[in-house]
Amino acid sequence: VTGQYLYMLHSSQAHTTVSEISALGNHTLLVDERDGKAGSDTFKRLYRIDLAQATNLLDLNNAYDPDKGGVLVDGKSLEGYVSHTDGAKANEQVAAETLRAAGISPAQGRLYLDVTKLVWGADPSGNTFSHDKVEGVAVTKGGQHLTLANDSDFGLEGSSHTGTQFELRQKEYQGKPETGEALDIDMTAVPQQYRGDGYIAPEVNTTDAGTEVKVA
């Protein structure tokens, strides 16, 4: 292990998780942050982070206790330290400021692409698969082209049981069985309103020797 960094989720209310982290460059990453719901008001976004601007926890001289959660600040785990005030626990910005005051800079996410707005903007009817659980993000051409893969949960929404009798419930979208889908995205063709300032077009140079892609 050469590095360990903190990343702040962007919406406490959305109960988001990180399903994928893909490399854009040597120290820039694309983070897939999402909820698990389907609909036009859901949270599915890709954020660009730069580890060069964040604190490597392995470089700290703080006490470390695996039984207490790892790196300690004032005798508390990082989670415990951030949660010791209601303001920091409920607001990611306050939490980041609390950590910076302790000498730790989390990786800051800059919006790269709002997947929800892109999908529903392209088809407001909802007939296009909404990609409720984006769990795979393939990056090519320095981030100009993305392929998103959706987890279908094996086509199962859940199960129910009465006594020893179990029944599996089929996962559906728009009344049809969900089998999972992939979404190819050409970022150069995505309207500006769906992108954020985290999208920086890479520099592409093509010569007789081949193609070189430089990521800022």
For every predicted segment, state its role:
Residues 1-216:
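Sequence/structural signature of beta-propeller domains
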